[in-house]
Amino acid sequence: MAALVVGVVLGGCHSNAQTAQSVDPLSEYHGLYTPSNTEAFQASMHTNHPDYDWGVWGHNLAKLVKDGATDDMYAIVDGKRSHKQFCFSSQSLYNKVREYVLDQYGWGTADYSERISIMPMDNKTACTCDDCTARGNTSTNATPAVTAFVERLAEEFPRHKFFTSAYHTTNTPPTTSLAANVGTFVSSIKLPMRVDFTKTEGYNEFVQNVKAWRKQCSRIYVWDYERNYDDYLSPFPCLLAMQARFKLYRDLQVQGVFVNGSGDDYSAFDDMQTYVLALLLDNPDTDVHESIARYYREHYPQTADLLTTYYWGLEQRAQSTNHLLPLYGSMQEMCESYLDVKEFVSFRSQLDKASKLTVGDERKRLNALLTALAYTQLEMYRTGLLAKDEETIGEMREILKGHSELKGMNNRDESGHSIDDYLKKWE
């Protein structure tokens, strides 16, 4: 799952040293990987960002090791050495990580610590060398060796916090309790993206997994998702679904959440959604509709009513139908779930006309949104959801070409497919 790889970071920030036992639910980490979660936004809304507040982030050991890797750092898979996975019993690997932590962040202090992620490479292989097998590894379970590696670091660097992941070969919890400065990310990928997910198998599996890890690990973060990763430019009404998820995490005593959005890439309605998500992480009982309306009144004074009415209508439709919101979905799937073609075309047209009466920051924001929505309408034409209209298609193409003048609007999805390449398909 590529969504667990994004944002590979080597860097770090200063954070207050804190034990997991002192942390209230959802109070320790509010990570938002979205383009609107800027440094200024983080300061005003108390959010976090992986580029700024992790010493090592994601599946990043390969970047850390770099050219200093030796053969014994890599796993034995099916009896052969594989450079696609690490051996977490390797003394050389431990020495390399230890050296990096000490060189970059030192021992930490009572007031300074780093969050450091120690995760296997993002695949389903596990090392079964003699040492890893002796620790309890199997071909499908790397938890024993990985947690032993992390525990060793945590003991040597008690001021820093070390995180692993409940994902792929480390999904199974350890059999012994982990230190207070060790945490784990539990992926919510199997928790269906819909407003009411409580009657699904994925819900039961997720809850059981969090509770199982909770027995052995006192610091639990959730790695969550809030975007259609196949289409950043089209509307994605995730806020009521995210509110339901955050309420669940609070009930499960989860201390932190990382919400994986579109990273640095522009996505439709992201500025408003990032604002509301930040409020919901502070208080999952926040009134979503009022928060949306308040944001638009402040930042889009001339078009606030139009934007609020349309977007809230999408959220209400997603709630009333309880249809699955596709994390990887086509235009047809989005229209089956929440988009109404005629309603969308009418909204985009009205917004375009209204935008011409705006000035300053509102005009700039609307220009970006209308550019993104031109892609949505082109996709409706391309997939046959709209009858071909060469004049309007030409107009949408010209609008979308303006993406090159806008910050962050180069890619249309997680895989990095460019808008320019998409436009070439229309030539």
Question: Which role does the model predict for each range below?
Answer:
Residues 98-105, 147-154, 206-214, 242-246, ...:
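Generic structural signal for well-ordered alpha-helices
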Residues 27, 31, 137-153, 180-199, ...:
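Acidic, His- and aromatic-enriched active-site or binding-groove loops in soluble protein domains
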Residues 92-95, 204-305, 309:
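Structured mid-domain segments that build the active-site/substrate or prosthetic-cofactor binding neighborhood
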Residues 163-193, 233-241, 266-274:
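Substrate-binding cleft/loops of secretory-pathway carbohydrate-active enzymes
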Residues 11-12:
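C-terminal motif of bacterial Sec signal peptides marking the signal peptidase cleavage site
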Residues 280-427:
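Catalytic domains of carbohydrate-active enzymes that cleave complex glycans
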